[in-house]
Amino acid sequence: MLVVITGASQGIGYAVAEAFAVAGHTLCICSKTASRLKEATESLQKKYPNAIIHSKQADLSKQADCNAFGNWCLSLGTPHILINNAGFFLPGNLMEEEQDVLESQIAANLYSAYHTSRAIVPAMIKAGAGHIFNICSIASLHAYPQGGSYSISKYALEGFSKNLREELKDKGIKVTGVYPGATYTNSWAGSGVAPSRIMEAEDIAKMIFAATQLSPQAVVEDIVMRPLLGDL
């Protein structure tokens, strides 16, 4: 299968790439940071020689980069799976955060998925099959202090995912929203939170991979995951 994963150089994106690479699939991955992407690509190819790893630097907060990345993926074939993972978390209070934070969070966390999907999904529609995963967040489901514009952008991403599900279900295309709680990535380093208190990125990757193993007539609409002891 041809699997497209955005924001795949670290964290959940890299863990998802590993889950599909170990199964020998062909991957198209991207990251905003070229050096991290190069390192991730080399690591994946070395660890999983039976997989084929294609990579391209792209800043998906920019529509032009979404279109360029999408067209590049299509030049390699029709994707079977699209995992919209690109984005970032910036904590803050709505009345105190810096000017333009909302715009940057919407661009990174919503527009990236919107424009990348618009570039790739028409080929899936033509093929009559495909599976799209949108990496939302627990912050898509309820508000919390310091959620700020990040939470707003993730609520919007949930709306995008739900609408996409309704539009594509009669075209043979599955859409799954993924709602992870606290997951240990580099952003937690130095936070004082023990890694054992929160989930591993591999936990989310395993659930995403499992959701792709169902019959064509079955879909997991939502994957909600939290640390065993609950949200922080």
Please state what every model-predicted region is.
Residues G177, V193-L232:
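C-terminal helical subdomain
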Residues A34-S35, Q57-A68, Q99:
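The beta1-alpha1 cofactor-binding region of Rossmann-like NAD(H)/NADP(H)-dependent oxidoreductases
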Residues S9-G11:
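Conserved glycine-rich cofactor-binding loop
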Residues N93-L94, E98-I106:
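Substrate-binding pocket helix/loop in short-chain dehydrogenase/reductase
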Residues S137:
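Residue(s) in the substrate-gating loop at a strand-loop-helix junction
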Residues A23-A40:
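Conserved glycine-rich Rossmann-like NAD(P)H-binding loop of the short-chain dehydrogenase/reductase
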Residues S117, S153:
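Active-site helix of classical SDR
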